[in-house]
C-alpha cells in the first residue's frame, strides 16, 4: 500500500491555501531566486491516521485524512483572566501609589516642621500688641466687630508687593520718588488726622469745590472742637455730599496717569 506524502496534494482532496500560493508564486514574485526557493513551515504538524478506524460505525471512506493545520502554540489554551484578577491588580496598583504619596507627604511635612522648629528659637519673643484703638472697639457679639477683628491683624503685617503696588497706584519707584513718596501715604489723604491733609486738590481733577470746601471745614474751629465736628462740617458744605474714598482714589489715579503720560515722549500718530 502506497502512502502519499502529506506535503503533496492527493487527487481526492482540494489543495490547501499554502499549496495554491506555492503554485501561483510566479504571478506575484518577480525575483527568480525567491521563486525557486521553498519556505519550510515553522512548525510541522504530525501526520494524521492514514487508515480508517476499524470500529468506525459511520463507515468512513478509505482515503487518508488530511493533516491538520500546523499550530504555532501549545495545544493547551491559556485561561483568560477574569474580572476578579483585573480588580485585584487595580487594587494593588492603587495601594502602592497611595503608599508612595503618603511617603512623599510625610517627607514634606517633616521638612516644614523641621524648618519651623529651627526658626522658632531664633525668632524673638512676641511682644504684646498695644490696645486696639477706639475705632476697632465693639461688642464681641456683633458680626461687625467679628469682621473687624478678622481684618485688624493684617494691619500690623508688613506691606506686600501687591499692597505696595496699589498704594503707589501701579507707578514705578523712580516716578514715585520724583513725585514724592509722602504724597502716597495714607496719612496724607485721611481726613481724621488733622487740618493739614488734603490742602490742595490733585492737578488732574476737574472739580475743586469739594476739595476747597473740605479744607475750609478741616480748618474751621467747629471741627477742632470735638463732639459736634462732623455735624458742623456737614452744615458748612451747604448740603453737598462728601467725596467718597472710591471717587477720591479715582481722581488720584487719573492725576497720576496724566503725570505719567506727560513724562512719556509724545507718540506719532499712525493714521
UniProtKB/Swiss-Prot annotation:
Compositional bias of kind Polar residues: 1-13
Coiled-coil annotated residue ranges, if any: none
Record region (Disordered): 1-84, 118-149, 186-242
Pfam families according to UniProt: FAM110_C (PF14160), FAM110_N (PF14161)
Gene it is expressed from: Fam110d
Highest taxon above the source species: Eukaryota
Organism per entry: Mus musculus (Mouse)
Protein name: Protein FAM110D
InterPro entries: FAM110 (IPR025740), FAM110_C (IPR025741), FAM110_N (IPR025739)
Recorded family membership: Belongs to the FAM110 family.
